[in-house]
């Protein structure tokens, strides 16, 4: 509410004469809210304290991840002053980045399970929000969350972020000025030590806002009388007229409720059924009506009749339902990956294949619950038919919104969509691109390699540190034989990348044929996807044989904790320490089934226990065995040169551009030219650059004087054979033309950096 200080105020005189339509605009424009000024933007903690007791006027629930095609099932609740996240699977922060959902204001995280499907994105997300300046955050959910974070401390270093774990298994959970969250613990009927947490969230009631227009119409003078009306008191004007508070305030908003359900297996159904009466009673109260139910429950449970019956009996016909992980949710929400792939696909379709995931949600039977934009607008006939339809659903995608306050209803206007024609048109509008593309097509076309070609190198993640909307973190899939794959590093979201590139059916086949995973070192961006990949592989029917896990032995405490306290994945792998291969390469029958004759490692110049690796394959090229060397993260390293001598392909990190050599040294990474020189020094036939800083989201800045004839730039979802690499450099004219505006921006940044350095040098000389 805005209080005018005196009757002589020019603002108030203006209010008396303005039309109603302009009145509120003038009031809003004139108000100087002390809580939103620049001073408080620089002091978020002060702002938070000031708003601690304010009940928000806007509350929206946003689907961040729909659970489709390897995407997480995650929901973001945001209000005027706070943010809450419900579940945080792998890829959550990448979706947040893509859809401009700010995580820097996140205050509370609620997890329904402590298994990887619900919390796999937590390590990366906590590191990211720590860098964004968040200093403390609440973490609510099942037992062992605190000990899980403790077990991650080797690779999730939280020096400036305090995470406050809260075990919600006893029922009490969380309350602030915005909402109250009660937990519904479900105990596994076969194993009482295991539990999941469901949540009942109840918004605090909000008093109706004072309507200044109505106050003016009633002749209320500015001053304390406005405050009395705001507080719900009737007043008497000097002329004896009584003005009732109810006549000049908007309707108050009730303590609306919304529910999160997660029933991961049939063993939790008996516990769920015991909560039916409580949920039904909550929904029958007008002041606490259940407007929305979000189902994290997997489809094989939510499709059961017992679950459907529970939903019908426990919630009113007016409650709306959002089903995450439904088979109708067919688009992951990673639109930027499709965009760049459609653009690159024009250059070489077999090197940059279109992504295999389903591109749109196919609506089946639409229920009333998701057809209606506003609950209040449902007519009586539709309501009468709702009973039969309320457990049916249509697909949702990232950015499906539900407005809880000020109005209740589903909003699809911001949903993530794919527009392939627009992606291609963007490149056609670039001056000179079509001419260069036509010239390239006339002069050369890549060999028509079949889908069964091998050796083949598939890049699933080519960015460093944190996921970007176009470059995921490190992961490289090598097809070593017709029925064998090896994975080099396994950053967050690796499984999702496989499914989105190849589709579900082929993705499952690749998962079965995956024979080994190599982890170069224990920085989070190189192995956070490991647990998720092992879980998915373990669920294959029939069960796949254990794969070989090559990793630093220091990963053992983390894996032992997860196997002991959370869930078993240890039967899905056999651990071999990278250090054990320093003196004695892995060879013989153990690796022959991988299409490999030997695997060797070396220490590289990065963090402690960082390794490079070299694979010698049984497959040959030009009558010679194919040798693939991968640097992991490293500065220029002689031991790596010796290990990879005469490699067919060197895959080397190129985190920084050449101008940032000192920064690369401080962070123990390599520049582009350093990586290329490493290839020359080891006499590698081809060098592929990867692990780019996320400042080079589309294309890295390359040195103008380098010979790029034997050098390729890696992109996510790029797959190349040895034959492809021989001709990759011919793509560069069209590629750089396509991203000319972006590369020009990189050049301008470099010039600004150089000018800044020059000023520093001159100041130092004076």
From Swiss-Prot:
GO CC terms of this entry: cytosol; mitochondrial nucleoid; mitochondrion; nucleus
Catalysed conversion reaction: Endonucleolytic cleavage of RNA, removing extra 3' nucleotides from tRNA precursor, generating 3' termini of tRNAs. A 3'-hydroxy group is left at the tRNA terminus and a 5'-phosphoryl group is left at the trailer molecule
Residue range covered by the transit peptide: 1-25
Coiled coil location: none
Transmembrane spans: none
SUPFAM superfamilies per record: Metallo-hydrolase/oxidoreductase
Subcellular location: Nucleus; Mitochondrion
CDD domains in the cross-refs: RNaseZ_ELAC1_ELAC2-C-term-like_MBL-fold (cd07718)
GO molecular function: 3'-tRNA processing endoribonuclease activity; metal ion binding; RNA endonuclease activity, producing 5'-phosphomonoesters
GO biological process, one term: tRNA splicing, via endonucleolytic cleavage and ligation
Keywords of this entry: Developmental protein, Endonuclease, Hydrolase, Metal-binding, Mitochondrion, Nuclease, Nucleus, Transit peptide, tRNA processing, Zinc
Enzyme type, top EC level: hydrolase
Induction per the UniProt record: By juvenile hormone (JH).
EC annotation from Swiss-Prot or TrEMBL: 3.1.26.11
Main subcellular location: nucleus
Cofactor(s) of this protein: Zn(2+)
Note in the entry: The dual subcellular location may be due to some alternative splicing and/or initiation that changes the initiator methionine.
Family: Belongs to the RNase Z family.
PANTHER family in alphabetical order: ZINC PHOSPHODIESTERASE ELAC PROTEIN 2
Protein purpose: Zinc phosphodiesterase, which displays some tRNA 3'-processing endonuclease activity of nuclear and mitochondrial pre-tRNA. Probably involved in tRNA maturation, by removing a 3'-trailer from precursor tRNA. May participate in tRNA processing in the developing embryo.
Assembly and binders: Homodimer.
The name this protein goes by in its record: Ribonuclease Z, mitochondrial
Annotated source species: Drosophila melanogaster (Fruit fly)
Gene name of the encoded protein: RNaseZ
């Amino acid at each position: 509410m805005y209080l005018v200080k005196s009757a002589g105020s020019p603002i108030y005189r203006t209010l008396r004469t303005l039309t109603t339509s302009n009145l509120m605009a003038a009031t809003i424009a004139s108000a100087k809210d002390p809580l939103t000024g620049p001073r408080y933007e620089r002091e978020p903690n002060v702002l938070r304290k000031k708003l601690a007791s304010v009940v928000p006027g806007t509350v929206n629930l946003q689907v961040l991840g729909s659970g489709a095609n390897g995407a997480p099932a995650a929901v973001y609740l945001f209000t005027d002053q706070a943010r809450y996240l419900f579940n945080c699977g792998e890829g959550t922060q990448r979706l947040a980045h893509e859809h401009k959902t700010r995580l820097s204001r996140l205050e509370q995280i609620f997890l329904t399970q402590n298994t990887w499907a619900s919390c796999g994105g937590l390590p990366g997300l906590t590191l990211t929000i720590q860098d964004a300046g968040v200093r403390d955050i609440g973490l609510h959910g099942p037992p062992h969350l605190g000990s899980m974070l403790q077990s991650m401390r080797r690779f999730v270093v939280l020096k400036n972020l305090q995470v406050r774990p809260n075990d919600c298994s006893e029922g009490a959970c969380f309350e602030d000025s915005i909402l109250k969250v009660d937990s519904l613990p479900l105990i596994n009927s076969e194993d009482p030590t295991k539990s999941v947490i469901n949540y009942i969230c109840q918004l605090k009631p909000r008093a109706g806002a004072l309507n200044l227009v109505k106050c003016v119409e009633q002749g209320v003078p500015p001053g304390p009388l406005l405050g009395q009306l705001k507080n719900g008191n009737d007043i008497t004007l000097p002329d004896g007229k009584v003005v009732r508070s109810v006549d000049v305030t908007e309707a108050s908003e009730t303590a609306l409720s919304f529910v999160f359900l997660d029933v991961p297996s049939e063993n939790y159904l008996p516990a769920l059924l015991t909560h039916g009466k409580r949920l039904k009673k909550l929904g029958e109260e007008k002041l606490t009506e259940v407007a929305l139910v979000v189902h994290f429950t997997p489809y094989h449970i939510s499709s059961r009749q017992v679950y459907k019956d529970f939903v019908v009996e426990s919630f009113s016909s007016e409650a709306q339902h959002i089903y995450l992980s439904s088979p109708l949710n067919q688009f992951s929400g990673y639109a930027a990956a499709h965009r760049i792939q459609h653009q690159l696909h024009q250059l070489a379709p077999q090197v940059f294949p279109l992504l295999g995931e389903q591109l749109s949600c196919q609506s089946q039977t639409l229920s009333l619950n998701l057809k209606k934009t506003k609950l209040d607008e449902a007519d009586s006939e539709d309501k009468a038919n709702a009973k039969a339809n309320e457990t049916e659903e249509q697909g949702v995608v990232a950015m499906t919104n539900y407005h809880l306050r000020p109005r209740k209803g589903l909003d699809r206007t911001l949903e993530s969509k794919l527009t392939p024609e627009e992606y291609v048109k963007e490149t056609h509008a670039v001056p000179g691109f079509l001419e260069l593309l036509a010239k390239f097509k006339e002069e050369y076309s890549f060999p028509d390699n079949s889908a069964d070609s091998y050796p083949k190198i598939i890049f699933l993640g080519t960015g460093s540190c944190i996921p970007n909307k176009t470059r995921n973190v490190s992961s490289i899939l090598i097809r070593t034989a017709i029925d064998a794959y090896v994975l080099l590093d396994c950053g967050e979201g690796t499984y999702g990348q496989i499914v989105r590139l190849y589709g579900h059916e082929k993705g499952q086949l690749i998962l079965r044929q995956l024979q080994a995973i190599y982890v170069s070192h224990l920085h989070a961006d190189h192995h956070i996807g490991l647990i998720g990949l092992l879980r998915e592989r373990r669920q294959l029917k029939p069960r796949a044989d254990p794969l070989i896990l090559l990793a630093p032995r220091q990963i053992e405490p983390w894996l032992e904790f997860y196997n002991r306290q959370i869930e078993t994945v240890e039967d899905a792998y056999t651990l071999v320490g990278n250090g054990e291969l320093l003196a004695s390469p892995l060879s013989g029958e153990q690796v022959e089934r991988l299409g490999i004759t030997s695997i060797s490692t070396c220490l590289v110049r990065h963090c402690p226990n960082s390794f490079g690796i070299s694979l010698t394959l049984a497959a040959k090229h030009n009558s010679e065995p194919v040798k693939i060397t991968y640097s992991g993260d490293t500065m220029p390293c002689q031991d790596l040169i010796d290990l990879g001598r005469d490699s067919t392909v060197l895959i080397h990190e190129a985190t920084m551009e050449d101008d940032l050599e000192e920064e690369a040294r401080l962070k123990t990474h390599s520049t582009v030219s350093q990586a290329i020189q490493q290839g020359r020094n080891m006499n590698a036939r081809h060098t592929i650059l990867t692990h780019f800083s996320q400042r080079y989201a589309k294309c890295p800045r390359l040195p103008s004087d380098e010979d790029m004839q034997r050098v390729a730039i890696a992109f996510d979802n790029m797959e190349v054979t040895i034959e492809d690499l021989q001709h990759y450099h011919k793509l560069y004219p069209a590629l750089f033309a396509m991203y000319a505006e972006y590369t020009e921006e990189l050049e301008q940044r470099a010039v600004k950096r150089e000018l800044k350095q020059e000023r520093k040098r001159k100041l130092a000389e004076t």
